């Protein structure tokens, strides 16, 4: 069904195509063959662990716990997911997060007794504008309210509203700071009679660039040049 039916897996001229071939079944196969070659050539002089994550698209809820157990003490970690067109190697990547904002108001007839109500939609609008001020493209920090809904009818003061917020950030410090700022903004009430709650936070931590990572990239670059790759 779906993509698998529209673009089924096939092998033609020694090349495999289809969903997941590049991202990242080919990387998994490459890992296995590389490990086998290193072992046969006697080039493994330290413990090496291969780990395959089955739930990465969901945020690795299960695999992340295993990673936390095997990573301490590791000299290096290499991910065989494709980095980009032309064989690019990724040495850093932004983290991401999701937050879910809910606002409760009080319903009333918008024509007969408007003042008896408290609009959750107006309140979430104020909060959304406040949250948007944390956007900082120069720092690589994005804060996006991508989904919003609320109310029951056009002639009713909205008794509820909710939104979903997506975050990306380059450093863990920036991610933690923006989550704290969003929670603070949500705690401030503009429309009397409304209340709000927010859940969620950082989902995937950033892969921050560092000196050790740059040194590892240098080794990868040198190895690529030996194979005629640049």
What label would you give each PLM region?
Residues 6, 39-41, 66-68, 90, ...:
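Short, flexible, glycine/charge-rich loop motifs used to bind or transfer phosphoryl groups or to couple energy/partner
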């Amino acid at each position: 069904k779906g993509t698998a039916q529209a673009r089924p897996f096939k092998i033609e001229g020694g090349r495999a195509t289809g969903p997941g071939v590049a991202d990242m079944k080919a990387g998994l196969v490459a890992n296995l063959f590389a490990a086998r070659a290193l072992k046969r050539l006697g080039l493994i002089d330290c413990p090496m662990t291969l780990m395959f994550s089955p739930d990465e698209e969901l945020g690795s809820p299960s695999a992340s716990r295993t990673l936390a157990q095997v990573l301490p003490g590791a000299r290096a970690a290499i991910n065989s997911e494709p980095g980009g067109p032309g064989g690019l190697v990724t040495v850093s990547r932004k983290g991401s997060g999701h937050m879910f904002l809910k606002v409760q108001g009080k319903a009333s007839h918008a024509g007969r007794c408007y003042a008896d109500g408290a609009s959750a939609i107006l309140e979430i609008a104020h909060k959304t504008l406040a949250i948007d001020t944390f956007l900082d493209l120069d720092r690589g920090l994005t804060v996006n309210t991508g989904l919003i809904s609320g109310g029951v009818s056009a002639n009713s003061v909205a008794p509820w509203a909710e939104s979903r917020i997506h975050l990306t950030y380059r450093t863990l410090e920036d991610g933690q700071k923006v989550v704290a700022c969003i929670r603070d903004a949500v705690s401030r009430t503009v429309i009397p009679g409304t209340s709000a709650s927010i859940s969620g936070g950082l989902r995937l931590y950033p892969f921050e660039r560092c000196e050790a990572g740059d040194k590892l990239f240098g080794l990868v670059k040198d190895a690529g040049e030996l194979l005629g790759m640049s």
